Amino acid sequence: MAETLREHDTYDLYRRGVELLEDASFSEATVPLAEAARRAPEKSSVREALGRAYFRNRQFAEAAAEFEAVVETHPVNDFAQFCLGRALSLSGERERARHHLALAANLRPDREDYRLYRDRLRAAS
C-alpha cells in the first residue's frame, strides 16, 4: 500500500512538472520534477522531462546529466541523444556533443533539425 501511494505521489509530481514545463514555467518545473527523479531515478520519462526543464532554464550541465541518465538505459532514444548533444554543446563540451548529435541524426535521418545541429557543430570545428 505504501509503495502504491509513493508511486502515485511521484506520478503527481511528474504531471505537475510537465504542466509547468508546458506553461513555460521552466524554473518552477524543475522543483517537482527533481523530486520525482529523486524518488524514481529509473524512470526515463521523469529524467527526460527534468532535462527539458533544465535545458529551457539554461542550466545546460544539469540538463546534460539528466539526458545522459536516459541514454545510458535507452541508447536508441534519439530525442535524448539529440538533447544531450545540444546541452553538451551549450555547456562547452563540443567533442562529446558531436558524438551524441551524430547518433541522433543517424537514428533518425528523417529529422532535419538533428542533421542541422550535427552539421553546424561539425563546421564549427
Describe every region a protein language model picked out.
Residues 23-35, 57-69, 91-103:
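Structural signature of tandem alpha-helical TPR/SEL1-like repeats
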Residues 35-53:
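Short, charge-rich amphipathic alpha-helical segments embedded
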Residues 1-6, 10, 98-125:
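Terminal, low-structured helical/coil segments at or just beyond the last alpha-helical repeat
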